[in-house]
């Protein structure tokens, strides 16, 4: 018998495999990391201990008659710097941290994800609701305790990924995460994060793989329904003699989608490097991204003349649950008015410094760049009687065939003056169109952003049981929002009259929606901008501190943090270029600053090795989102913009053994 712990932090290792090739006997460790291997013969025995994420331990033991106590055995993490990343990410210990948390290992995700979307792996987690929404690739959303994603903090390696303007999370931007996740943890309620993040409903902490200690590689293929195919390859150099270790992973995923007209294609890449400078200092770098495009099933309105019965299997009226009213074919290929495309790479540079056994400094600098958007229709079809089928009031009516698919080839012919079959609606201005004229184009609503930040945490052990933590969280974000012409659909140009500085802008350049292209500057070079063009700027400075007490039976903490967020809007369409700075007609507003933060406290008491009780509570003051500060999509400042405040308290009981984990 014996026990297994993590050599880096002393945590128990449940579910590890212990196997003796000498006697062909094996077992697994229980929830506390303890194990008992029976049936070994006296004499020398070969023992192999393995656990996902840890270096395999091989040893030869001398076994005597009777019980043999091996004591506590330590396993070293196979990924370098992984424990430090978990500290930055505020990963809770399921039995010692006074929050309700559920943790999934990378091995569990790998074994169970299949061709599900990343959030769907959490659908059986308490207090979690996951839906695929329209059914497009990456369009899933998640609710924690009923709160939507704007009130759930999502963090990768401790770095927040909620949009800096509206707090949303777009899972299609992170399609490759399931392949590189080391640990996924959901904390319900205010959670254990030290940052002033929007964790009213809870937080989702994702820790990615780090550079692997062992040299090796792997390749895999996954196939599924509706043409789903995924190829993956991973390579690791292992730790080399110069202290450098590098791991690389790449995937390609494609399919037709379960819902009609929702074809998709996605790539993902991951590169992590760790360098051990000396015994007290190391650095690591990680880059990950997932360029993708996918067709969507967009919501419908009453003007589309659609009803729930259209999605039934009724032979008379229904078209089935897969019905999608936004797609058709163009030149024999699938074409959809609604297409999402994006590329959002994120890079981390982490530095770990041990001043002494009692004092450590962990710093993560990061940058996130994003470009892409979503397409939709623009224009109208109008007949002699004045009936209009336009992009606002029924683009699915009058232009669909008997199967409910949009007749895109006919739209192209109509735009060129060669077709008049839409309810006898002749095109009065072929080969050109405006939003108030005849014909359709496909536009793309774009979001191009740059996000820079640094997170630094200092930990100091005041005593054997007491630890003080303090840190800084600084961020700067700039988001550029505009629409561009994506497909002329047979027209030669599109006339936009929305720009006060260029009221008769004839656009002839179309920029295809293929992934997210950082090199595409046609919206500037070709003046390909329509409907709107504005920038959103957000600055963030936060300070945090925590005092934690811990012994064998209990733990308690109290934490405080505060942040200042600044918001600024620049509008290039609704205000003239030569307007006086600082005036009511200026393109740029002044910075609008808001203070916020939270205070939390909690304690956890272990009744025995299997049971615990805990309590926590806190007060949270959350700054308003960008759109609640600037009204009506212009520079009008909301005089009533104010923080949201939340007071929360929680009492809980937890039970753990080798088979049951209840809280």
Feature roles, as predicted:
Residues 8-9, 16-21, 48-54, 64-111, ...:
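Short, acidic, small-residue-rich periplasmic hinge/interaction motif at the N-terminus
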Residues 73, 175-218:
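A beta-strand signature from Gram-negative outer-membrane beta-barrel systems
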Residues 36-39, 110, 141, 160-188, ...:
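Short acidic/polar hinge/loop motifs at secondary-structure boundaries
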């Amino acid at each position: 018998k014996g026990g297994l712990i993590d050599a880096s932090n002393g945590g128990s290792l449940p579910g590890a495999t212990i196997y003796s090739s000498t006697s062909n006997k094996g077992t697994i460790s229980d929830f506390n990391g303890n194990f008992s291997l029976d049936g070994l013969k006296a004499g020398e025995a070969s023992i192999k201990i393995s656990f996902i994420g840890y270096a395999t331990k091989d040893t030869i033991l001398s076994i005597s008659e009777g019980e043999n106590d091996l004591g506590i055995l330590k396993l070293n993490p196979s990924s370098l710097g992984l424990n430090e990343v978990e500290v930055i990410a505020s990963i809770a210990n399921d039995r010692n941290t006074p929050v309700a948390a559920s943790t999934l290992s990378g091995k569990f995700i790998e074994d169970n994800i299949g061709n599900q979307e990343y959030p769907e792996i959490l659908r059986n987690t308490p207090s979690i609701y996951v839906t695929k929404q329209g059914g497009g690739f990456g369009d899933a959303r998640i609710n924690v305790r009923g709160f939507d994603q704007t009130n759930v903090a999502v963090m990768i390696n401790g770095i927040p990924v909620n949009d800096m303007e509206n707090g949303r999370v777009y899972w299609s931007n992170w399609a490759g995460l399931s392949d590189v996740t080391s640990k996924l943890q959901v904390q319900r309620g205010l959670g254990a994060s030290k940052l002033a993040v929007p964790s009213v409903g809870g937080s989702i902490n994702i820790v990615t793989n780090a550079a692997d200690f062992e040299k090796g590689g792997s390749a895999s293929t996954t196939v599924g329904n509706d043409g789903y195919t995924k190829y993956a390859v991973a390579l690791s150099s292992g730790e080399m003699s110069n202290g450098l270790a590098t791991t690389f992973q790449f995937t390609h995923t494609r399919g037709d989608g379960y819902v009609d007209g929702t074809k998709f294609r996605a790539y993902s890449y991951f590169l992590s490097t760790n360098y051990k400078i000396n015994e007290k200092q190391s650095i690591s770098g990680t880059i990950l991204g997932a360029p993708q495009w996918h067709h969507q099933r967009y919501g419908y309105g009453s003007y589309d003349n659609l009803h729930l019965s259209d999605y039934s299997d009724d032979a008379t009226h229904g078209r089935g649950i897969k019905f999608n009213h936004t797609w058709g074919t163009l030149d024999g290929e699938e074409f959809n008015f609604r297409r999402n495309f994006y590329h959002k790479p994120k890079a981390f540079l982490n530095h770990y410094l041990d001043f002494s056994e009692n004092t450590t400094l962990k710093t993560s600098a990061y940058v996130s760049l994003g470009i892409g958007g979503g397409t939709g229709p623009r224009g109208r079809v109008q007949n002699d009687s004045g009936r209009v089928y336009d992009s606002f009031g029924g683009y699915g009516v009058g232009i669909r065939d008997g199967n409910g698919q949009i007749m895109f080839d006919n739209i192209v012919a109509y735009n060129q003056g060669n077709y008049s079959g839409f309810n006898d609606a002749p095109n009065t201005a072929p080969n050109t169109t405006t939003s108030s004229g005849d014909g359709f184009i496909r536009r793309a609503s774009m979001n191009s952003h740059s996000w820079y930040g640094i997170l630094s945490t200092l930990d100091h052990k005041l005593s054997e049981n007491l630890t003080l933590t303090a840190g800084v969280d600084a961020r700067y974000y700039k988001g550029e929002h505009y629409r561009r012409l994506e497909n002329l659909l047979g027209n030669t140009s599109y006339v936009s009259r929305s720009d006060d500085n260029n009221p008769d802008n004839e656009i002839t350049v179309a920029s295809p929606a293929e992934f997210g292209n950082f090199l595409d500057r046609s919206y500037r070079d070709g003046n390909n901008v329509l409907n709107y063009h504005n920038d959103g700027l957000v600055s963030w400075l936060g300070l945090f501190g925590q005092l934690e007490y811990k012994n064998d039976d209990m733990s308690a903490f109290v934490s405080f943090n505060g942040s200042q967020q600044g918001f600024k809007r620049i509008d290039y369409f609704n205000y003239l270029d030569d307007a006086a700075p600082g005036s009511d007609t200026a393109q740029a507003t002044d910075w609008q600053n808001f203070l916020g933060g939270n205070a939390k406290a909690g304690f956890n008491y272990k009744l025995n090795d299997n049971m615990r009780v805990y309590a926590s509570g806190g007060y949270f003051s959350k700054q308003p989102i960008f759109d609640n500060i600037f009204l009506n999509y212009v520079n009008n400042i909301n005089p009533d913009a104010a923080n949201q405040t939340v007071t929360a308290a929680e009492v809980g009981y937890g039970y753990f053994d080798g088979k049951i984990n209840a809280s």
